[in-house]
From Swiss-Prot:
Known role: May function as a riboflavin storage protein that binds and sequesters riboflavin, thereby protecting cells against undesirable reactions mediated by free riboflavin. Protects bound flavin against light damage; flavin fluorescence is rapidly quenched by interaction with Trp-39.
The keyword Protein transport is annotated on this UniProt entry: no
Record family assignment: Belongs to the dodecin family.
Upper classification of the organism: Bacteria, Pseudomonadati, Pseudomonadota, Gammaproteobacteria, Chromatiales
GO molecular function: nucleotide binding
Protein name as annotated: Dodecin
Subunit structure: Homododecamer; 12 subunits assemble to form a hollow sphere.
SUPFAM superfamilies for this protein: Dodecin-like
Length: 70
């Protein structure tokens, strides 16, 4: 197993359909501009309430990716 060094970014994804989709939205967006994504950690979950019901989910994730070179 080789040694790795990871860079971590923190992102917040959102979705009206649930937590899992909010996470997937954050990871998909990160994948558009970052390479070598390796893992994520959910660090916060929030929701927006409207009319007494959950209207929207927000999930903050830390995303780790390996650095190129070296």
């Amino acid at each position: 197993m080789s040694d790795h060094v990871y860079k971590i970014v923190e992102l917040t994804g959102s979705s009206p359909n649930g937590i899992e989709e909010a996470v997937n939205n954050a990871i998909a967006r990160a994948g558009e501009t970052l390479r070598h994504l390796r893992w994520f950690e959910v660090v916060d979950t929030r929701g927006h309430i409207e009319g007494g019901r959950v209207n929207h989910w927000q999930v903050t994730v830390k995303v780790g990716f390996t650095l190129e070179g070296g």
